Amino acid sequence: MKFQIDKTDGNARACTITTAHSVIKTPIFMPVGTVGAVKSLDALDLKEILDAKIILANTYHMFLRPGSKIVKEFGGLHGFTKFDRSFLTDSGGFQAFSLRTNTKNDDDGIHFKSHIDGSLHYFTPTSVLDTQYDFGSDIMMILDDLVALPADPKRVKLSIERTIKWAKKAINYHLQKRESGVGLNQNIFGIIQGGTDENARKFCAQSLCELPFDGLAIGGLSVGETNREMYDTVEAVMPYIDSARPRYLMGVGTPEDIVENVERGVDMFDCVMPTRNARNGTLFTSFGKINIKSARFIHDDTPIDPCCDCYTCKNYSRGYLNHLYRAREITFYRLASLHNLHYYLHLVSDIRTAILEGKFLEFKKDFYSKRS
């Protein structure tokens, strides 16, 4: 993987990440394809309509079904899904945490029960990498010890101790595998934990920056803290994250979260929000969100957002989308998801343009003024 910083504007950065499968201009938002597909969309939608350069797939779900060996038989995620651009795969630790299916963490990994059939499994720092080697993902995330917020200080301390221990195991294992010819085009990111404790975050960040990870992620946020706590935590930890590597804020978030955290130096984002909200009838626009299922749109022949040039806005009206939603027509999910993801991808593209032009603060002011 190649990484270069193209321009900075304050702490905001416009960078370029080059993997074996695509060139990724940052800031970037990664659509979430939990089970190898972004819900209601296929690879052609992602490539030809949205022009997505990278998407995320979930190790927990793909490990349980269909299984990493089956994915490998098809040539990894790229061959299996026919999305031939970049994939980032998470470690599965967050799903084991969030689904709470008899999950138990110990010093060596995470025990969990499958939400599908109740079978018992154990994720370790090395086993999740073996799974991701089978997937052939371009960016692999290490296993980390995640805690819900607010958290007891003793639990936060244990979390960062385990996360650092697991990070060392993971990077050493990855370097050994590369020497044997495995994972040569695969990159590995460390994950910084520490809750909202600034000293814990600082210690974890400094410890992980000593290791030769290709990039660094901030994990364990958007799990119960306030927006202000999130922003303050990111701002506090950022000076201790190596600026020469990509910075990824995991599982975040709203358009406002993206703008605020780009300002603090984050390069990469992912979240299920645009597709989940789309399926529930909430659509993002340049002037805020609208609820397309509202009766006030029944006779509305205008597009979702007059300023949007997405496939849905160029071809269909609010009234038609309102009808599709009320009729529970599956076509609605595709059209709404295309719009919301287009909004997110163009938001980060517009932010990048503003950074390159040295106008990020002007962009931010305009962004919020349209929502007031």
Swiss-Prot record:
It comes from the Bacteria. One of its GO terms (molecular function) is metal ion binding. Pathway: tRNA modification; tRNA-queuosine biosynthesis. Its EC number is 2.4.2.29. Pfam families: TGT. The active site is at D90 (proton acceptor), D270 (nucleophile). It catalyses: 7-aminomethyl-7-carbaguanine + guanosine(34) in tRNA = 7-aminomethyl-7-carbaguanosine(34) in tRNA + guanine. InterPro entries: ArchSynthase1/Queuine_TRR, TGT, TGT-like_sf, tRNA_ribo_trans-like. The keyword Glycoprotein does not apply. GO terms for cellular component: cytosol. Substrate binds at D90, S91, G92, G93, F94, D144, Q193, G220. One of its GO terms (biological process) is tRNA wobble guanine modification. Homodimer. Within each dimer, one monomer is responsible for RNA recognition and catalysis, while the other monomer binds to the replacement base PreQ1. HAMAP family: Q_tRNA_Tgt. NCBIfam families: Q_tRNA_tgt (TIGR00430), tgt_general (TIGR00449). Belongs to the queuine tRNA-ribosyltransferase family. Catalyzes the base-exchange of a guanine (G) residue with the queuine precursor 7-aminomethyl-7-deazaguanine (PreQ1) at position 34 (anticodon wobble position) in tRNAs with GU(N) anticodons (tRNA-Asp, -Asn, -His and -Tyr). Catalysis occurs through a double-displacement mechanism. The nucleophile active site attacks the C1' of nucleotide 34 to detach the guanine base from the RNA, forming a covalent enzyme-RNA intermediate. The proton acceptor active site deprotonates the incoming PreQ1, allowing a nucleophilic attack on the C1' of the ribose to form the product. This is Queuine tRNA-ribosyltransferase. It comes from Campylobacter hominis (strain ATCC BAA-381 / DSM 21671 / CCUG 45161 / LMG 19568 / NCTC 13146 / CH001A).
